[in-house]
Each structure stands twice: as C-alpha cells, then as structure tokens.
Regions:
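Terminal intrinsically disordered, low-complexity extensions flanking WD-repeat/beta-propeller proteins
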Residues: 1, 249-251, 271-273, 282-362
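Conserved strand-to-loop turn within each blade of WD40 beta-propeller repeats
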Residues: 31-33, 76-79, 116-119, 159-163, ...
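WD40-repeat beta-propellers
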Residues: 36-40, 82-86, 106, 122-126, ...
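Acidic and/or Ser/Thr-rich intrinsically disordered tails and linkers
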Residues: 1-19, 26, 318, 362
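Loop/turn segments within WD40 beta-propeller blades
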Residues: 19-25, 64-70, 76, 106-112, ...
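A short beta-strand motif characteristic of beta-propeller blades
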Residues: 4-9, 45-54, 91-96, 133-138, ...
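WD40/WD-repeat beta-propeller blade-loop signature
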Residues: 16, 60, 69, 102, ...
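WD40/WD-repeat beta-propeller blade N-cap
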Residues: 9-14, 53-61, 97-103, 138-145, ...
Length: 362
C-alpha cells in the first residue's frame, strides 16, 4: 500500500502536461490549476509558492521542473510564458515569453532551461539572462511537445511529441542550422534553429510523453507510448537502434529508473490506471501497485531513490516505497526524511492511505 495519500483538488487530467516534480533538496512541487504548492519532506510543511492567475485571470500552470540545485523551480504556463522561482525566498527571479502556446514540459541542463510547447518548438534558455534568453531552438516536431529529458552526461536531449515522434538531439552535432529571425525581443539575434535531430525515431504509434535515461548505461533511453501504442521501448541513442519493445497493454504516462539501473517503474492510464515495476533488462514485471481510479499521469522520484510519488485525475497524490534505498547520484541528498509518516498535505489532504489503495504482486 502507499505510505501516504494526499488530496490534490483540481489537478488537471491532461496527458500532455507535467505537473509534479521532486527536488534534490527533498521538496515536492505540485501544480493545481493556477497555483503551485511545495511540500518539504524534512519539515513536513506545505506552502503555496505562487498563484499565476494574479498576473492574468486566465493563467494556469502547465508544467513544473526543479533545477539540479534544488533551489529553483521552472514553471510553464498555458500562455506560453515560463517563470523561474527562487523557492527558498518565495520570489520569481525570471520570466520568459517566447512560446506562442502552452508550455507542457520543462527540463534543466545546468543553467539552461529547455521548454517544449504546443507551438511545436523547443527553446533552450539561459536562465541567468534578463533578456534575449533563447540560446537555440529545436524545431522538428509536427505537433505538441510533451516529453523532454536531457541525458545524464548532458549531451543528448530526448524529445517526445503528440506526433508520435521520438527525437534525439545532440548539442555537439549541428547539421542544417539556420538563423532565427529576430522578430521577438526575447530571442537573441545570434540564436540558431536546428531542424534536423540526430535521430528521428518513428516506431511509436501514439504520443510519446514518458522518457527516462538509464542512470548507469550511457546512451540507453526508455520511452513509452500512448493509448494506441502502449509500449515501453529501449533505445541505443548512439546508433538510433531500438534495443527492445514491451507491450504493457495500457497507455504509458511516465517512466523512471532505480538508481542502480536494474529496475524501472512505469505509470499507466487507459485502461489499467496502475503502476508497474519492471526488472531490467528482462523487462519482467515484479510488482503492480493499484489504488488510483483514473490515469496515473504524473510521477516524481525521491532523491534517495526509494520512494515515488504519483498523481492522477482522481485528485490524489500517492507515495510508494518501491526501490531499495541508495545514497543517490553524486550531489544528491541521502535518505528521505522519516517525517513522511507525518505528512502535512495540501488543502483537504487525507490523514492516511485511502481505503481503495492496494498492492499486488505481478
């Protein structure tokens, strides 16, 4: 069973958004419509970071992602804007308005903020720049960009879209580049647009949101497809070759590796709405976690590698202990605070695990 269940009133049931993340400093961020909340696992305190509707009645949050330093949070909006927040001081330090449609996914690569949008573009921003923030643009998706992940060595970016495409971009490889027209004040005249990725992988037959790089095997990427695909595929991103394909029988919403790279967790939507634990490389399922009653659209992994948080359209957040505890990658804190058992929730949070929560071995 989950170690805790919280209410998440009003969380959006939208496959293309990314509304929850867990920082290296042990804080969970969750976006509920126009508001972003942060729960601190060390103190068990929950605070509202911001309400973006204060800047416009129709504004709401479409994505959140922590920087690697655990201090700054990138927040994407339905308007196409991206905000950078200093969470410790509760203040907005940057705002970029380059995209013309909603920003459904945000990713960090050190000081670079990478944003993906329904306008089909991926922008790389210098988070330190007060203006002309865009360093480069990747423009090859044909529909909304809903998945972004930089590789652990920071050289390759995997992007997934509603066009069923999985693209691999390499920041050391720059074919067919052209200058970006400087029609927008936020885009530097020297920024470049790249239209040809290193690899254009077309095997998925539905939207590609779920992306996860192996923490131990360089160039190994896991990707998951939507309702008409349902497959977890493994890729060698040095060659562009598919390593394996596993039909999960259900929409794949998220993927995350154990810290030692020997296990994988996936969350699912139509039709199972459950969480599956897999052995790698056999891709043999060894656990199924049930309890959510709608699509498990959002997943976040604790810094110690042991716990995952899942959020769904059923307006609950569930915390599960799924992997062996580890010291974590370099620069990450160790064990999750025992204060998890005294979790102080968002408004209307449950006191304990819901009655509908259950766990069963595969």
């Amino acid at each position: 069973e989950p170690v805790k269940v919280l209410d998440a009133p009003g969380i959006r049931d939208d496959y293309y958004l990314n509304l929850m993340d867990w920082s290296t400093s042990d804080q969970v961020s969750i976006a509920l419509n126009s508001e972003v909340y942060v729960w601190d696992a060390q103190s068990s305190q929950t605070n509202r970071l911001c309400d973006v509707s204060a800047e416009g009645d129709g504004n709401w949050v479409t994505s959140v992602r922590w920087a690697e330093n655990g201090k700054h949070l990138a927040v994407g909006l339905n308007t196409g804007a991206v905000q950078i927040w200093d969470v410790n001081h509760g203040r907005k330090v940057r705002s970029f308005s380059v995209h013309t449609r909603r920003v459904g996914v945000v990713e960090w690569n050190q000081a670079v903020v990478t944003t993906g949008s329904r306008d089909k573009r991926i922008h790389n921003h210098d988070s330190r720049a007060r203006e002309n923030s865009v360093i480069s643009t990747y423009y090859a998706h044909e529909q909304e960009v809903c998945g972004l992940r930089w590789s652990p060595d920071r050289t390759q970016l995997a992007s997934g879209g509603n066009d069923n495409l999985l693209l691999i971009w390499d920041n050391r490889y720059t074919p067919q580049e052209s200058l970006v027209p400087s029609y927008h004040p936020e885009i530097a005249p020297v920024a470049r647009t790249f239209r040809r990725p290193l690899f254009r992988l077309r095997d998925h037959t539905a939207a590609v949101k779920a992306l996860a790089w192996s923490p131990t095997q360089r160039g190994l990427l896991a990707s998951g497809g939507g309702t008409d695909d349902r497959c977890i595929r493994m890729w060698n991103t040095h060659t562009g070759q598919q390593v394996s394909c596993n039909d999960t029988k259900s929409q794949v919403c998220n993927l995350s590796w154990s810290h030692d790279g020997t296990e994988l967790v996936s969350t699912h939507g139509y039709s199972e709405n459950h969480i599956v634990l897999w052995k790698y490389p056999s891709m043999r399922p060894f656990g199924i976690l049930s309890g959510h009653t709608k699509r498990v659209l959002y997943l976040a992994h604790s810094p110690d590698g042991q716990t995952v948080a899942t959020a769904a359209g059923d307006e609950t957040i569930r915390f599960w202990e799924v992997f062996a505890k580890s010291a974590g990658p370099p620069g990450r804190p160790g064990a999750l605070s025992s204060s998890m058992s005294r979790l102080v929730g968002l408004p209307g949070s449950s006191a304990g695990a819901g009655k509908d929560a259950s766990a069963a071995a595969a």
